[in-house]
Amino acid sequence: MLLAFVFMALGGVRADLPPPRPDTASEKSVVWFALDSQVMGPSMTPRQPLVSRMVAGLICAVTGKNTPDAAWCSFIKPGEKVGIKVSSQPGAIGGTHPAVAQAVVEGLVAAGIKASDIIVWDRRQEDLVQAGYDKVPGLNLRWIEKGAGYDPRAIITTTAIGRLVYGDLSFKESQNSLADILGPKAQLSEESHLPIILSRDVDKVINIPSLCDSYFTGVHGALAGMTIGILDNWRRFSKGDGYGDSSLADVYSDQRIVKKVVLTIMDGIVLQYAGGPYPSPGNCEVNGMLLASKDPVAIDATALRLLDEQRMVSRMPKASRDGGHVAEAAAKGLGNNDEKMILMKRVGFGSRGSISSGEAVVPETAPSPLPATRL
């Protein structure tokens, strides 16, 4: 049931919204996916060679290039600094697996990008450690909180208002009582700040969210990961009932974000269908899938449908009920969320592991889905 959908569907001033992208606003978007039933190894650790093969196949498919080196160079040029944004908050099982980030790093280095020009980053060091990134040699890890910090000059303003707390850049410590701080004298703001990593340190971003639900946004995916997942004063977007949907779409459309994110690869090796964006291993299923697209909206729309399917099996409300920001992003021209405007295409591999003829194929008949494995 879990994969049935896949195969059946086979400065302080708000930035102006970018014009609709011609490849997503008026044409169908393509979400490529790679499946491997053997990708998850012992002790819930993905097998690196299989992950690397899947990533190489996806990058060739997305770009239409014949080799991974040529594919990576179509996104990142030598001398550019690239930030690989991961989603480590859901933990070692439900979050972005280090093997996926490592495959991207190795692919970029093989394509001629200096290792010193590549960073792997997220909001908190403790999340990266919990997810196992500190155990992978050669990764240049960076984090925002208690690390690089937020940029006081990179302000994002929206209509959503939130209460500032300790850790937000504009929060001012007070000697008042807790009741005063949380009551009428609470510090309120409609501003958030971009992290210095994004505003100053990197030229391009490869976003690697995981296939994880979110209590706040339905899916903790491409859009949420590059908005709620990186800003301070993010709680103002997560009050429920669609309160922050339009604002989240506005934030992602800011040129300082949307122009830097060149590719989204979603780690669907495991699907976490409840408890997100926090660790919840009991609500995870081995899924054996990676997805990739230039359209972050299409990736998130696909993820919501997969989550809805699994939550239906588990007799839970649909995740899409809290995922209104995806439709808002589509309405603002950031991509496609309509299932009829999204083409699901599978990357195929030859008997020796090479990408099959045509580099990526869509089976004419739906193959049998991988059996979901409950953890």
How should these model regions be labeled?
Residues 1-9:
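Bacterial N-terminal signal peptides
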